[in-house]
Each structure stands twice: as C-alpha cells, then as structure tokens.
C-alpha cells in the first residue's frame, strides 16, 4: 500500500489499528472510538475538469459552492465512483487515504482540521485505520488550506 511505504520512508511515527468493517468515515470514527473531528475523509472533486483531493473531517460535509469560489473555478463537481476507484487503484473502494500527493492530485485540507493535534484515516481497507500527528501529515502532504465545509447536524 502506497501510504505505508510513504510513512515508513521518513520514519514518521504512526499507528495502524484494526476495527470491524467500516464503510464511511463516521462508521470508522465510531469503530475507532475517535471523535469525528479527528477522522479525515478524502473527497475527490473535479474543478474545471481537473481532479483534486479535498480532505475534511468525518462530521463535516463539503460545500462545493464555497470550494468553487475559493478556487476561482468555473465548475466544481464530485468525482464519480468509477473515477475514484481508478484513482485509488491500490485501495478498497471508498477507503483511499488523504494523501493526494500519492495519486498525483493537488490536496486541499479544510481549515476545520488545521488545529487538530492528530489525524486518523482509513488505511486503504475497510478494516484498518492510521493515526498520526497533524504536523507530520502536513509536512508530508503540504496541503493548501481553505474553508469549504460545514458541520453535519444530526
């Protein structure tokens, strides 16, 4: 898996945990007993026809209008499931890690994640998660920080 290879190279401290199958970021947060604000989910969008990875908290939803305005794009839309499967060719569908740089995608992180001390995300499968420091994540990925999400209400 590309993400483990990347994390092992610079000797980044991280923890891999196993959990019951989780098919959404919110399910993984519950399985990991982790608040949704610390669980990152990558959302692949097409901005003016170019793929980008947006990283936001599990308990937030993407605001495509806000993203479009901040990018200065003419159009922003969610990528199709088939496209996502082709991008994350080394992962189970829906479990790609939030590392756009591993998939030649620009990475944009939501400002709501910026002050978190750590980040947890799917490790490419429905049964494994990776937890690492936010500082290390930001050094490895160098995401652009924008505000493009809103908190989901119950």
Question: Can you say where each PLM-predicted feature lies in the sequence?
Answer:
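Extended, low-hydrophobicity, polar/charged segments
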Residues: 1-154
